[in-house]
Amino acid sequence: MTSYMLGIDIGTTSTKAVLFSENGDVVQKESIGYPLYTPDISTAEQNPEEIFQAVIHTTARITKQHPEKRISFISFSSAMHSVIAIDENDKPLTPCITWADNRSEGWAHKIKEELNGHEVYKRTGTPIHPMAPLSKIAWITNERKEIASKAKKYIGIKEYIFKQLFNEYVIDYSLASATGMMNLKGLDWDEEALRIAGITPDHLSKLVPTTEIFQHCSPEIAIQMGIDPETPFVIGASDGVLSNLGVNAIKKGEIAVTIGTSGAIRTIIDKPQTDEKGRIFCYALTDKHWVIGGPVNNGGIVLRWIRDEFASSEIETATRLGIDPYDVLTKIAQRVRPGSDGLLFHPYLAGERAPLWNPDVRGSFFGLTMSHKKEHMIRAALEGVIYNLYTVFLALTECMDGPVTRIQATGGFARSEVWRQMMSDIFESEVVVPESYESSCLGACILGLYATGKIDSFDAVSDMIGSTYRHTPIEDSAKEYRTLMPIFINLSRLLENQYTQIADYQRGLITHK
């Protein structure tokens, strides 16, 4: 009898459920969105119950459509870095505080500068930053004492879901390694990190491998989801590490680059490793597979800003003609030669995570002359996003013990031929676009196949995932980028103090409004 597998990806803007055949073909996918509550510049929260209902209803839509298809297991992918404070009655004291919430910025700075933060990073693998639960919980225990005094647990969104399903507080090693509080070598909570956070191990969930299987789901919830309560649930991992699995970037030297709204670059190694300069993360996939890399804030949001602020007339024409506005932007960029005639754009419109880990950095054009036109600025912005990812790539290659063999490119940007070729030229590497568009859900299911013993290694992934586009570097273009890249990198270093000064000035404008 043919069996099927269900991958569920709990994301920041929506939850996706995808039903796959066991050879990786998509049978059906469902998605339910939910709001991100941002009442001010620093707050980014969600309602955990809305997310739980999205998990139930995406699954129910699929099982209702395919009642005859036997689901052999359900496996989970989840966004990282969320925090929910829970009281002694297992009820939330806070909304779900997401990775994008910056209210713990002051505590992240204090941990980094005064509380031995770099040594904590080297043991835990998560750069000290407001995104990390370590910073968020330290902020709650020190500045929100009315919450901390009632908090029995601090959990993430996947832990909240599994508590509803199985009445247990459990966290997989992958999500735990993204908290800033798990010792990578000991696979246990780090004493010093917990001391900084102001909590004990009892405040956190039980640590389990990403391959841990749960059964005996709550009968009431199983009915709502349309599944057998004995269906195996694989706890799974974080969306980032599973994306590498889902695009077949798992062998030594293979790198996955994703650009959606934000972006990331990652590779898999066989044992945990951190960076002496603190530029990259190290998260668990399994005990033999660890993912190192860096996330960037400024991906597609830069293109959206260019679209809205620089190209309103072109976009209006595109809309009337039924053409995708982003296709128009990339066509405009094609009119300019690589390097934008010496115009550089630092794409830091939303601060930046890797490799700078500085929320105060700001965007800028450099090299403007009278001969530069709008199309130069558009191309420079596209190039700036890739330049920035390349600086993360350089940090990553310093931590790898061999050469890069290929780059797997995914996310919205992979649909643009201009951007794909630009990446190949700047990175001076072959760029391949895999056939998978649901990489985190597929990655969760591949991990599920491994957990349930249906495959004994991840080598089977290559049979599931073909490729659609392949680009190799154009030497003349690569030469231009080789000349400009050191200028791009040096500028961001030289402006470090000025970034802080201008960010302070901008914050002052907000408080005086």
Curated annotation (Swiss-Prot):
It is an enzyme of class 2 (transferase). ATP binds at residues 16, 261, 300, 412-416. The keyword Iron-sulfur does not apply. Keywords: ATP-binding, Gluconate utilization, Kinase, Nucleotide-binding, Transferase. Pathway: Carbohydrate acid metabolism; D-gluconate degradation. Gene3D superfamilies: 3.30.420.40. Its EC number is 2.7.1.12. It comes from the Bacteria. GO terms for biological process: D-gluconate metabolic process. GO terms for molecular function: ATP binding; gluconokinase activity. Catabolite repression by gluconate. Pfam families: FGGY_C, FGGY_N. It catalyses: D-gluconate + ATP = 6-phospho-D-gluconate + ADP + H(+). Belongs to the FGGY kinase family. This is Gluconokinase.
